[in-house]
Amino acid sequence: MKSDKIRIESILANGEHINLECKKATNTIPNSIWETYSSFANTYGGTILLGIVENLKEKDIKKRFQVVGVEDSQKIITDFWNTINSNKVNENILSDSDVNIIDIDGKKVICINVPQADWRIKPIYLNDNIYKGTYKRNQEGDYRCTERQVRAMIRDSFEEGNDGILIEHYNMDDIDLDSLHRYRNLFRVWNADHIWNEVDDKTFLRNLGGYIVNREEGKEGLSMAGLMMFGKGLSIRERFDNFRMDYLNFCNLIGEERYSDRLTYDGRWENNLYQFFSIVLPKMTFDLPRPFRMEGMQRIDDTPQHKAVREAFTNAIIHADLMMESAILRIEKHDDKLCFRNPGLLRLPLEQIYEGGNSKARNPRIQNMLRMIGFGENIGSGFPQIIAAWKETKWGEPELKNKIDLDEVELILPLGKVANVVNNDRKDDRKELTERQKVIVNLIKGNDRITIDEMTEKVKVSEKTIRRELSVLYEKGILIREGGRKDGRWVITK
């Protein structure tokens, strides 16, 4: 068809790249086609063209590719299907419509469109040898994956995630109780009537998926989620010396300064995910502009952009491959952008992520722990909400990068020229409470057993808004929750 010819000519005009491979294949299938099939399936997908020769010495793209055609296209296609359905590859992910014969100036070219394989069936490998027959693709072409890369794909294929594994010989003695109790206080704010508020720490952690009892093997202990979220720093480093967290602020540098603020392993905080998240999140959002906006008689300070930053940070944690060698969860603040980098590649194609595709978290138990205290949107809605929030500004478009060579994902939220603009009203907000927060504090002072529903009715805002305001009061150290859902009470600490 003419449209097919035009499409192929358009592809060739861009030159051979990460999504295109041309092979001569005059009368037989080249052996190298299977390496390309594996690499495309394990990377971004791509197009294989049989019957086209590339002259690498030719710098003019228009002259670089020569259409020579194949002699017996039907035979080659038959051989291709017979081979791909044998034990040459572990999975055939193609359908009939993915293989076509295209006529270009009287010559037959075979076009094979290889989609990116579903993350649940990766890696796609050759010759029944998963560690020697798995390939990926970069700008240089096909390359054999390292054992580390293969193991990462195998880990990613587990639908139930990886943070539920039992960490043998690690128990409640390895939990930083201050971190866990801070979390439980915030949990009470968001779930004041929840029955879990009445149980002991071990039972609470078990209910969250942070502690496991394996009855069949007679073993019990912390799960990866429990240790990484609430563990003592030393215990985490002993078990996961491959993983670290890093926050760097590169704003307003003076002279030879490398950074203006940093949070890394320095012995002054327990190096678990909950403390890292709790300490760094306010640093990332405190100077974002808060335009004056009213809801009824109350001022609204929680902007879509603040929500987007929380979502970006949450995503970086729940999608991080915590078991990867030299894994770094790195959060950066620059004068003109915010950067969130997590170890592990995207499970879905980029275009599906932008459309709101459901990419199951690598760490679903940690995801649930954060969601129970108000962090993380509904499945599939998080990234589109980030995009929508940034469209409301003139700061630039968010950029999501899948860095194959580094085995990491980076999300960049541009800030335009607003990073250094902190209005006077915002400065006042950090020193004193908002009017709504003052109303809530006064309600609690008048009745320390007031319920969330009663606050919602009196303040005349949604339950979600009340819970968000209570979270702010908790984070500022003004409010804590004591006791269970039946006999619990609010305590104003200052």
Regions found by a protein language model. Give the residues of each.
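Alpha-helical DNA-recognition elements
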Residues: V472-K476
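Flexible, glycine-/charge-rich segments associated with ATP-binding catalytic modules
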Residues: M224, R237-E238, L348-K431, E435
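Short amphipathic alpha-helical interface segments
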Residues: T434-R449
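Active-site helix-to-loop segments that bind/position phosphate- or nucleotide-bearing substrates
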Residues: A117, G133-E311, A316-E325, K333, ...
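Intrinsically disordered, low-complexity regulatory tails
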Residues: E91-M172, M324-A327, G380-P384, A388, ...
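Short, cationic-aromatic polyanion-contact patches
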Residues: R430-T434, T451, E482-K494
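Polybasic/polar functional segments that serve as interface/processing modules
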Residues: M1-I48, I52-C111, D118-R120, F230
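Key DNA-contact positions within bacterial/archaeal DNA-binding proteins
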Residues: K464
